[in-house]
Swiss-Prot record:
Gene3D superfamilies, sorted: 3.30.420.40, Actin, Chain A, domain 4 (3.90.640.10)
Pfam families: Actin
Entry GO MF terms: ATP binding; hydrolase activity
PROSITE patterns membership: ACTINS_1, ACTINS_2, ACTINS_ACT_LIKE
Designated name of the protein: Actin
Swiss-Prot/TrEMBL keywords: ATP-binding, Cytoplasm, Cytoskeleton, Hydrolase, Nucleotide-binding
Organism whose genome encodes this protein: Scherffelia dubia (Green alga)
Length: 378
């Protein structure tokens, strides 16, 4: 992957709790998008000589899910199992992108407020296991903002494992005002599993959960007025949709369609103490300097797969208008490519000429050790 002037393109790898997005800097979309899953056989090899692997990664794990136990090495946006994480990176470089990592600088992404030890471990694995020539760790929400063409704004980044509101001013995240909400796509999937059970549909295994995730992605939406929508659903069935399961049977989904994502705005429905995404965003803005709040209200950027529900931007706008000062201009931006905006921002950043002196080079790592990441990546 060399450019005309002999430069090697950087690799950009956005490791989400649910999906890995990976590709080459300068591209406008990731080449590889696959689930962040490592699967191990549930039963010892029945068929001798079938060449069964001890672990499967990504789509292969997904397709063999019937015989595997699936584990996600990234929980709530933070890596919790480094051995599995290494398998995912290995799979990304060698099987998905088909590159030799020792030949390319690598840009990785991390959750806001990622523990220091985690950044060091990422750095160490990249340099020592994969022998990369250079690497950098960027905060996910900041990359999403770059992808939307802004340097100031507040990003609501909601993925599969965690949601964050991150105020950013002139390209720098304001750590004191970042809020984290442990409520995201996976919780919505679990919630949908629960409310579908009330209808008598039983989904329990890790494999069946993936079916429910698909129902969520295809059929759910956010109601502008939840109470009103609930009332409507009790009187008419025009909101009902059918979904065909892998075995061909049809199930009917009604008010579950908007009840599922409603917990983003009312975590109380799940029995969670926390406040909803709109209030979290508002609290984040209020923690910022009074002079920059106007710029934040006017640049609320949605990012991540869990912001893909139809109706979410309008609802967000409505809820924030209700709590903000009445004269304040409020703008919620929901870019169509927001599912991949973290990756796209990484692709933009890693191909900027001004960024080239920001990389941590192998020589610097050899000299200073893993702690170099705190000095060079902020």
């Amino acid at each position: 992957m060399a450019d005309g002037d002999g430069e090697v393109s950087a690799l950009v790898c956005d490791n989400g709790s649910g999906m890995v997005k990976a590709g080459f800097a300068g591209d406008d979309a990731p080449r590889a998008v696959f689930p962040s899953i490592v699967g191990r056989p549930r039963h010892q090899g029945v068929m001798v000589g079938m060449g069964q692997k001890d672990a499967y990664v990504g789509d292969e794990a997904q397709s063999k899910r019937g015989i595997l136990t699936l584990k996600y090495p990234i929980e709530h946006g933070v890596v919790s199992n480094w051995d599995d994480m290494e398998k995912i990176w290995h799979h990304t470089f060698y099987n998905e992108l088909r590159v030799a990592p020792e030949e390319h600088p690598v840009l990785l992404t991390e959750a806001p407020l990622n523990p220091k030890a985690n950044r060091e471990k990422m750095t160490q694995i990249m340099f020592e296991t994969f022998n990369v020539p250079a690497m950098y760790v960027a905060i996910q929400a900041v990359l999403s903002l770059y992808a939307s063409g802004r340097t100031t704004g507040i990003v609501l980044d909601s993925g599969d494992g965690v949601s964050h509101t991150v105020p950013i001013y002139e390209g720098y995240a304001l750590p004191h005002a970042i809020m984290r909400l442990d409520l995201a796509g996976r919780d919505l999937t679990d919630n949908l599993m629960t409310i579908l059970m009330e209808r008598g549909y039983n989904f329990t295994t890790t494999a069946e959960r993936e079916i429910v995730r698909d129902i969520k992605e295809k059929l759910c939406y956010v109601a502008l007025d939840y109470e009103q929508e609930m009332a409507n659903s009790l009187t008419s069935s025009q909101n009902e949709k059918n979904y065909e399961l892998p075995d061909g049977q049809q199930i009917t989904v009604g008010n579950e369609r908007f009840r599922c994502p409603e917990v983003l705005f009312q975590p109380g429905l799940l029995g969670q103490e926390s406040v909803g995404v709109h209030e979290t965003t508002f609290n984040s803005i209020m923690k910022c300097d009074v002079d920059i709040r106007k710029d934040l209200y006017n640049n609320i950027v949605l990012s991540g797969g869990t912001t893909m529900f139809p109706g979410i931007a309008d609802r967000m706008s409505k809820e924030i208008t209700a709590v903000a000062p009445s004269s304040m201009k409020i703008k919620v931006v929901a870019p169509p490519e927001r599912k991949y905006s973290v990756w796209i921002g990484g692709s933009i950043l890693a191909s900027l000429s001004t960024f080239q002196q920001m990389w941590i080079a192998k020589a610097e790592y050899d000299e200073s050790g893993p702690s170099i990441v705190h000095r060079k990546c902020f």
